[in-house]
Amino acid sequence: MTKTTDTNKRPRRRQILLGTSFFLVGGLVLSGCAAGTTSSSSSATTGTSTSTSAAGDVTVAQAATEVTESDSSTTAETITNTTVAVEALLATLSDEQRAAVTYDYDDETKTTSWSNFPVTFVDRAGLNVADLTEEQQVAALQVLEALLSDDAYKAASNIIASDQYLADSSSSSDADILGQYYIAFFGDATDTSAYEVQFGGHHLGINATLDGTADAITFAPTHLGVQPADWTTEDGTEVQAFDGIYTDAFAFYNSLTAEQQETLTSGEVTMCAPGDTCEFTTGSGLMGSDLTDEQRELLLDLIANWSGMADEESAAATRAEIEATLDDTVIAWSGETTYDMTQGDGINFSISGPNVYVGFQAQPGSAGADIDGVVTSGWGHVHTIYRDPTNDYANSVEQQAATGMGGGGAPGGAPGDGGPDGN
C-alpha cells in the first residue's frame, strides 16, 4: 500500500483523517470480535451501558476532530496538561457523572474493565462518551489529546473513525455498539501523585498511569486494534490507522538476514489477552542478543508504537528500560513476509521479554462486518496488546481474572474457535 504522509504542521484545531460527513459513537475488541451481541446495562458506577444515540448531535469521531492542541515535550508537561484536561472535563459533569467516572487508584476494576471484546461482552468502567453532551464529549477527547503525542492521537482517532465507518457501512449486526467508548479515572487527577486514565471500547483500550512524584508515565497495559485497516472517506481521503505499525514491523523484518528471518518465522508466536493474568512465556524465536545495533533500534521503534505514546521524554525513558533487557527478549513472526495488503491474510508476531510484551494478530474473520471492496479480515482486522511484566498499571494493583469473555479469546480468537488461549 502507498503510505500517506502528512507534511503539514498540525493546525490549532485537530484535523483527523475523516471526512466532515463522518460520525461516530463507539466500540469493538483484540481477538474476539463477535456478531449478534445484545445490549446490557448496569449501575452508573460499575457497569457498561450501551447507547443508541448521543446526548447531543455530535459523535465521538466528530468530537475527536474538535479538540485543540496542547503540545508536550516532557513527562512533567504531559502530566500537567492531562491533569488540567481531566479537571476541565470533570467541571462539565454533574455530581452523578463525576461519581460514575472516578474510582480509587487501587480499585482492581481497572484490570478487568478494558478488553478486545465489545462493550456488550465485557463491562467498561466510567462514562459512555456517546451519552455525553457535545461539550462533554470534546472535553473527554481533550484528555486523550493532552495525554498522547501527535502520532498516537492521530492513530487513536483513526481507530475510532474506522469503527464508525464499520458501523455505518458494514453488514454487522452490532452497528449500534460500534464506536461506543468509555472514559474513567482511577485516583485523583493531580501532578503530585499517581492516577490512571482509562479510555476505550472495542478496538481501543488505553490504560495510562501518570505519576507526578516519580515523573513517569506508563501505557502498560494497552490494547490497539483496527477494522478495517484501510478505507477511503467520502471526500477521497485514505485512512490507514495501522500504517505506521505495519511500516515499522516490515522495516524490522526486512533488516534481517535470511538466516535470522528463518529463526524468526520458525518461532512460537505467544499471546496474552486483556483480562488474563498471563505467565508471559517467551516461547521460541529470534533473540534480541542476535540483533545488530541497527536491528535493535528498528525493533525498539516498532515497540514504541505502544510503549511510547506520550511525549518524547517519557517515551525515551520507557525505551531505555526495554533496551536494557533486549538481549533476553524473544521475537516470533508468522504470516506474510511482504507488506502488501492485497495479498495473503496478514501477519502475527510477538515480542516477549523481561520489560515488554507485544502481541500482534491478524484476525482470520470479519466477525460479520463485511463491506464490499474493503478488507475487514486478515490485514484489515487486527488486534494487539502491550503489557509490561514488571510494571502493568504501574504496580498499583494485581491483574484480576476477567469476567465475561475478556480472557481466553484474545488475541487469537473467540473462545472455542481454536485461537490461542492467551496464556
Residue ranges and their predicted role:
Residues 30-58:
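Bacterial lipoprotein signal-peptidase II cleavage site
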